[in-house]
Amino acid sequence: MAIVVRLDDLLYERRMTLTELAERIDITLANLSILKTGKARAIRFSTLEAICQVLQCQPGDLLEFQPYLGEA
């Protein structure tokens, strides 16, 4: 299974840069970049809440579950 982070899509739809989001939620650009590229192993609920508040979205808009092919 894989969790896909749709941050790029949400930023594009809202015409916002990653840098602007990082400043607005007070997180380093490096950490937000790790999340955006799907390399993060975890996300704090406080960070998820801040992202959702700024982007006016739900957690399910940001994170998507995609099962690997062949999994039942």
Question: What residues fall within each predicted segment?
Answer:
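A short, Lys/Arg-rich alpha-helix, primarily the initiator
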Residues: 1-16
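Alpha-helical residues within the helix-turn-helix
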Residues: 12, 23, 53
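Residues within the helices of the helix-turn-helix
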Residues: 8, 19, 49
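Short alpha-helical DNA-recognition segment
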Residues: 16-34
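Residue-level recognition of specific faces of alpha-helices
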Residues: 31-34, 47, 61
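Short, charged recognition helix plus adjacent turn
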Residues: 34, 41, 53, 63-72
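Short, basic-rich loop-to-helix N-cap that marks the start of a DNA-contacting helix
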Residues: 39-50
